[in-house]
């Protein structure tokens, strides 16, 4: 995707930061205000022209300069200041150093981490239209791996599933589809064909089947009012 106007402004503010530890408040505040405005538009004016851009409010981090993927350590004036902003502050050994990588370098590295983190459970999902992955699982795969954890796929699995994120799940969100609305797109199901009809529930079934066909374990799908949970070992 191409960077939108808001992303370009944000990247420019990052690029103009001086070297060394520095406060990011002035850089982040305009973006936080813009996000608040977008949230307001989504809630009160969904037909607004700004919302026609499906990437509004987003930054293509891998198409951006390396500044966006570089750690800018928080300015700390003393022990009290280090702990004052956090309920559970990270110990010093876990704090990223100034100038160290804040995320992986490219999309290929992210995909490698993603496949290990998800145990390839979404490898059979060939059509990602109207589906977006977000949340902690994505952030986990963006974070650079410790050297010891990147030695092998086995080491990566132990890092993700036993050390760093032992209870993490994968959050998928549907957009542009509701149970009542019909989207014109081809859909095939084992016992019948729905062409060109496609509803949100059919998309959910497709995701479930993709997970079921990708892992060697039993898969259970549980639907509640607002979510559908897919469980396996």
Model regions and ranges:
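Catalytic cores of the polymerase beta-like nucleotidyltransferase superfamily
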Residues: 1-233
């Amino acid at each position: 995707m191409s960077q939108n106007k808001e992303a370009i402004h944000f990247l420019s503010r990052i690029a103009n930061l001086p070297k060394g530890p520095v406060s990011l408040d002035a850089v982040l505040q305009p973006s936080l205000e813009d996000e608040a405005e977008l949230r307001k538009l989504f809630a009160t004016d969904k037909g607004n022209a700004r919302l026609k851009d499906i990437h509004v409010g987003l930054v293509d981090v891998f198409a951006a300069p390396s500044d966006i993927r570089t750690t800018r350590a928080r300015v700390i004036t003393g022990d009290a200041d280090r702990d004052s902003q956090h309920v559970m502050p990270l110990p010093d050994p876990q704090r990223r150093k100034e100038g160290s990588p804040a995320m992986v370098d490219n999309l290929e590295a992210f995909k490698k981490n993603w496949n290990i983190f998800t145990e390839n459970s979404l490898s059979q999902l060939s059509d990602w239209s109207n589906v977006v992955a977000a949340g902690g699982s994505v952030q986990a795969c963006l974070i650079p791996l410790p050297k010891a954890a990147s030695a092998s796929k086995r080491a990566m699995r132990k890092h993700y599933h036993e050390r760093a994120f032992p209870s993490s799940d994968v959050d998928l969100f549907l957009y542009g589809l509701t149970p009542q609305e019909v989207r014109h797109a081809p859909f095939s199901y084992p016992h019948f064909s729905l062409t060109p009809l496609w509803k949100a529930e059919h998309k959910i079934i497709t995701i479930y089947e993709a997970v079921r066909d990708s892992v060697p374990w039993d898969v259970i799908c549980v639907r509640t009012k607002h979510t559908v949970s897919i469980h396996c070992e």
